[in-house]
Amino acid sequence: MGGYSYGEATNSTELGGLVAKILFYDIETAPNLAYVWGQYDQNVVKQYREWYLLCFSYKWEGQKTTKVVSLPDFPEVYSEDPENDIAVVGALWKLFDEADVVVGHNGDRFDMRKANARFAFHDLKPPTMPMQIDTLKVARKYFMFNSNKLGDLGQHLGLGNKEATGGFELWAGCMRGDEKSWRGMKKYAKQDVDLL
């Protein structure tokens, strides 16, 4: 965050003589779908479909390139069921299992808990639990920025802003299988990790 460096390595960092593999990551999910009787102040009558992972972006400390893993990256699974996130979840599980430290913005409250929920759903044993650094918590605890939103922090610290999405339509387009939407989602997800 903001020019703070953890050292130079290909995918690990030396901390007091120990080598730590540090993973920066972010996930994007599809929304829950439900039946409702109205638009405002409504209870869900029945849930139609639960959320799932659309994609995740990641970069190892010391690497320049941020990668994105998404549902269409697994065409055999995706063509059979475009909502089946088993391959994406499995790829994320492997990274978590390899990492000593994971870094995400609001990762403790959202990304890690959502990831753990999908690991459990797919009967994956918990990965070797890495140490977590939540940059939102770090910003709140050690600094007094006007805003702790990732895009605002990135802009304030000269790292850039979040990628514009155009709103919910980007997520809806991905759920419909629209290739342009998937390109936009990957660009959006990549930028979130680049801001970390």
Q: How should these model regions be labeled?
A:
Residues 103, 149-196:
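Acidic, Mg2+-coordinating catalytic module of metal-dependent nucleases/exonucleases
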Residues 2-10, 14, 187-196:
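Acidic two-metal-ion nuclease catalytic site recognized across multiple nuclease folds
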Residues 4, 11-97:
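Conserved RNase H-like, two-metal-ion catalytic cores of nucleic-acid enzymes
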Residues 4-7, 110-113, 170-171:
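Short, motif-level signal for alpha-helix interfacial/capping segments enriched in acidic residues
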Residues 16-19, 124-125, 181-182:
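Short hydrophobic "helix-edge" motifs at membrane interfaces and signal-peptide entry regions
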Residues 26-28, 111, 134, 192:
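Acidic active-site catalytic centers that drive phospho-/nucleotidyl reactions
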Residues 62-156:
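Conserved DEDDh/DEDDy metal-dependent 3′-5′ exonuclease domain
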